[in-house]
A protein has these predicted regions:
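Short, surface-exposed loop or secondary-structure junction motifs
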Residues: 1-216
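Hydrophobic beta-strand positions
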Residues: 57, 233-234
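Generic C-terminus detector
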Residues: 248-254
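Short, well-ordered beta-strand elements
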Residues: 231-233, 239-248
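Extracellular/periplasmic catalytic domains that process cell-envelope and extracellular macromolecules
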Residues: 198-200, 234-237
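Short, small/polar residue-rich loop motifs at catalytic or cofactor-binding pockets
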Residues: 226-228
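A conserved acidic, glycine/proline-rich C-terminal tail/linker
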Residues: 218-221
Length: 254
């Protein structure tokens, strides 16, 4: 959850990208949970496959699929109906699916969604769910409201759990990686540009946080991103949660 497991996404790490191309040339099918460590656990912060493993652990402990667990404990209590890991089983959501676009240098071209997203081998805790912006905001609103949905009144998290989610967890990690350099590097420029994280950042149990006040953002605010330039933030001091989704690659293109 803190991304110090030693697992890294290939798009941000040359060593993992090299392994992926060598072991699975041309993007052949592979089991993401079989990806090797890029560093020893606890040694360095690196954005990667940790949440995929967290989702897998939830499945093993609960005896439920990740989708069923999320439906029971998050989606249903929040009144969310437009979110799923299995988009091919939801014709109603497929009909509303926003196009995925890539910048070619002369403009944007619509491209197909990757097959592992449309027909997943497993339900990915790191980025396998399709959801509407309204559904995503319903989750953020519950977190902003101390774990209680302001719409349904259902509690999905203890208030103390929400507080713990905002506590920096990486300040004593020996290798701060991108948190220290302020730049999340890229190994696959077609998918992501180098991402400026800025200085004075840490990772919590769930997100990037700024240790000091920034322009328009209170100290201790939450933020993170999706690869297709999808952004979210929570500022608890100001009582604001916000999203901005473009659904376009590469990540970080200005």
């Amino acid at each position: 959850m803190t991304h110090i497991s030693g697992l890294r996404y290939a798009v941000f790490d040359p060593k993992t990208a090299h392994w992926l191309e060598t072991a699975h040339p041309g993007g052949s099918q592979f089991a993401p949970l079989d990806m090797p460590l890029s560093s020893e656990p606890g040694e360095a912060w690196a954005y990667g496959m940790s949440m995929e493993w967290a989702g897998h652990i939830i499945e093993r402990v609960s005896g439920m699929s990740l989708g069923a667990y999320v439906e029971k404990h998050i989606l249903a209590p929040l009144g969310i109906q437009d979110a799923t890991f299995q988009i091919e089983t939801r014709d109603d959501l497929k009909a509303r699916l926003a196009g995925l676009h890539a910048h070619t240098g002369e403009g944007f071209t619509e491209i197909p969604y990757p097959e592992p997203l449309m027909r997943p081998q497993y339900e990915s805790g790191g980025g396998g769910m399709f959801a509407s912006p309204r559904a995503y905001l319903a989750v953020l609103s519950a977190v902003l409201n101390g774990g209680v949905s302001p719409t349904t009144g259902a509690r999905i998290l203890k208030a103390s759990t929400v507080d713990e989610m905002f506590v920096p967890q990486t300040l004593n990690v020996p290798d701060q990686g991108a948190l220290g350099s302020g730049i999340l590097p890229t190994a696959m420029p077609a998918f992501s540009r180098p991402i400026p994280l800025g200085s004075g950042k840490a990772w919590t149990l769930s997100h990037l946080t700024n240790l000091e006040e920034e322009k328009g953002k209170s100290a201790g605010s939450a933020e993170w991103y999706g690869l297709a330039n999808c952004y979210w933030t929570i500022d608890r001091q100001k009582g604001v949660a916000a999203i901005a989704f473009s659904n376009a690659l590469p990540f970080g293109r200005e």
